[in-house]
Amino acid sequence: MKIYLVGGAVRDSLLNIDVKDKDWVVVGSTPQEMGSLGYQTVGQDFPVFLHPKTKEEYALARTERKSGQGYKGFTCYAEPDVTLEEDLLRRDLTINAIAQADNGELIDPYNGQQDIIDRTLRHVSDAFTEDPLRVLRVARFAARFHHLGFTIAHETMNLMKVLVDSGELSHLTAERVWQEWQKSLSSQHPEIFLSTLKECGALAIVLPELNALFGVPQPEKWHPEIDSGIHTLMVAQQAALLSQDLPTRFAAQVHDLGKGVTPESEWPSHKLHCHTGIKLIKRLCDRVRVPNDYRDLALLVCEHHSNIHRAAELRAQTFIKIFDKMDVWRKPERLAPILLCCQADHAGRLGLETQPYPQKQRFEAAFDAAKMVEVKEVVAAGFKGQEIRDELNKRRIEAVKDKLDIK
């Protein structure tokens, strides 16, 4: 029985990245032996165990043979005669197929260390094409390590395209699609996840609403980048620079979905995209099972971003109507991420990335003024029933007028 540290922990240590989780592979053992040593069984599809003290995962070395469709269509063999090299061979990328012995020796049969030096994401073997999830995983790693200079090997991109053409991606569950997408949101360059899926053809299958944006023009006066898909990638990048919050980053990526269904006869104008986008976001979130907090923020950004961009032109009562729809009186924490998404939208335009966005400060000032008007003051003044609501609105409008010097 031999135990090796494998996968992400070895890779990240070689990249001088803090190691958060450790995974281990056990060669030459059985489930019975692991159980007798106090390890707890947790794997349903293949033998995985939790260490009795550290609770880290220990998996028996295994091979996998394609026996069906999708990422679950595999038959596993995890007997004591499976070698470490055979276990590493089934892994997706060479940088994830390096093991470390307890004496520190690195076992690297597929040249993962060289690919780390070369900053290359490369498949281990042609068996890569047997698992459709790997297309999304490689896209996520491309996003995660983009800031370090990693790119996808040409041969690996070709295999990703083969996987897409095979139809296997249609067997991915909503949960796995969202899991990879959500993980990509935490990277420094989440836009690379989307652009990689676009390049290999997977975006049209797993996220068709986003794919539909590419090739759709916008007015060059406001969008020098013209293409709605390119704009979306730029907004995703700007959102990542502005906020670490994942729902904010998600909302920025999907805020313009309505542009993908604008009739060609109306191009490059998209006057109704804030309304048509609502339905598309709901459909996307239902299908991919996006959490409600992500969904709710995305819907608010989609509905209101065009009006927020027009902050300098808005009447005081329009500010109050928007605040009412956002329900920021009860949920004031909503306003900041909505405005950050709008700022990212504004900055996500070719050559205009550093242009100031005073609309954000104007909305913040309007809300600060309006929320100073308290219900108890209106009630104390003798108003009752519907009168309270009407007077509250009236006072809030006046407060915004005074603060923003609106005539």
Curated annotation (Swiss-Prot):
Listed EC numbers? 2.7.7.72, 3.1.3.-, 3.1.4.-
Query: What does the UniProt keyword field contain?
Result: ATP-binding, Hydrolase, Magnesium, Metal-binding, Multifunctional enzyme, Nickel, Nucleotide-binding, Nucleotidyltransferase, RNA repair, RNA-binding, Transferase, tRNA processing
| Residues where ATP binds | 8, 11, 91, 137, 140
Q: Which Pfam families match?
A: HD, PolyA_pol, PolyA_pol_RNAbd
Q: Which InterPro entries match?
A: CCA_bact (IPR012006), HD/PDEase_dom (IPR003607), HD_domain (IPR006674), NT_sf (IPR043519), PolA_pol_head_dom (IPR002646), PolyA_RNA-bd (IPR032828), tRNA_CCA-adding_enzyme (IPR050124)
What GO MF annotations does this protein's record show? ATP binding; CCA tRNA nucleotidyltransferase activity; cyclic-nucleotide phosphodiesterase activity; magnesium ion binding; phosphatase activity; tRNA binding
Q: Which CDD domains match?
A: HDc, NT_ClassII-CCAase
**Cofactor note as given:** Magnesium is required for nucleotidyltransferase activity.
What domain of life is recorded for the organism? Bacteria
Keyword tRNA processing annotated: yes
**Which SUPFAM superfamilies is this protein grouped with?**
Nucleotidyltransferase, Poly A polymerase C-terminal region-like
What reaction(s) does this enzyme catalyze? a tRNA precursor + 2 CTP + ATP = a tRNA with a 3' CCA end + 3 diphosphate; a tRNA with a 3' CCA end + 2 CTP + ATP = a tRNA with a 3' CCACCA end + 3 diphosphate
Q: Where does Mg(2+) bind?
A: 21, 23
Name one process (GO BP) from the record.
Answer: tRNA 3'-terminal CCA addition
User: Which cofactors are reported in the record for this sequence?
Assistant: Mg(2+); Ni(2+)
Q: What is known of its domains?
A: Comprises two domains: an N-terminal domain containing the nucleotidyltransferase activity and a C-terminal HD domain associated with both phosphodiesterase and phosphatase activities.
Q: What else is known?
A: A single active site specifically recognizes both ATP and CTP and is responsible for their addition.
What does it do?
Catalyzes the addition and repair of the essential 3'-terminal CCA sequence in tRNAs without using a nucleic acid template. Adds these three nucleotides in the order of C, C, and A to the tRNA nucleotide-73, using CTP and ATP as substrates and producing inorganic pyrophosphate. tRNA 3'-terminal CCA addition is required both for tRNA processing and repair. Also involved in tRNA surveillance by mediating tandem CCA addition to generate a CCACCA at the 3' terminus of unstable tRNAs. While stable tRNAs receive only 3'-terminal CCA, unstable tRNAs are marked with CCACCA and rapidly degraded.
Q: How does it assemble?
A: Monomer. Can also form homodimers and oligomers.
Q: Which family does it belong to?
A: Belongs to the tRNA nucleotidyltransferase/poly(A) polymerase family. Bacterial CCA-adding enzyme type 1 subfamily.
Q: What is this protein called?
A: Multifunctional CCA protein
- What lineage, starting at the top, does this entry show? Bacteria, Pseudomonadati, Pseudomonadota, Gammaproteobacteria, Vibrionales
Question: Which gene codes for it?
Answer: cca
